[in-house]
Regions:
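Amphipathic, hydrophobic secondary-structure cores in small proteins
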Residues: 1-47
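C-terminal structural segments of small proteins and small subunits
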Residues: 48-79
């Protein structure tokens, strides 16, 4: 399944990308898509069988499932 995670800080995005790659998943940092908003403007796109909560940094803002150009909110740290 494909996901995109947004973050409160750029460092959090970097740490999450590294943790996901270390766990063997495909991950890449990128600018946040226009349809989404985030504090730092950087996101991580990744492919994994589930959210991989253990790899997400504590400053993760939101995680969305990605289906083409559509995003479905799965996790919101503000709630």
């Amino acid at each position: 399944m494909d996901f995109v995670a947004t973050f409160h800080t750029h460092l959090s995005a970097l740490m999450t990308e590294r943790a996901l790659k270390k766990a063997g998943f495909t991950a890449r940092m990128a600018p946040v898509p226009r349809q989404l908003s985030s504090s730092c403007g950087t996101c991580v796109f990744y492919t994994a069988p589930d959210l991989c909560r253990d790899a997400l940094d504590e400053d993760t803002e939101r995680v969305y499932a990605v289906n083409g150009e559509c995003y479905s909110l799965l996790l919101d740290s503000e709630e």
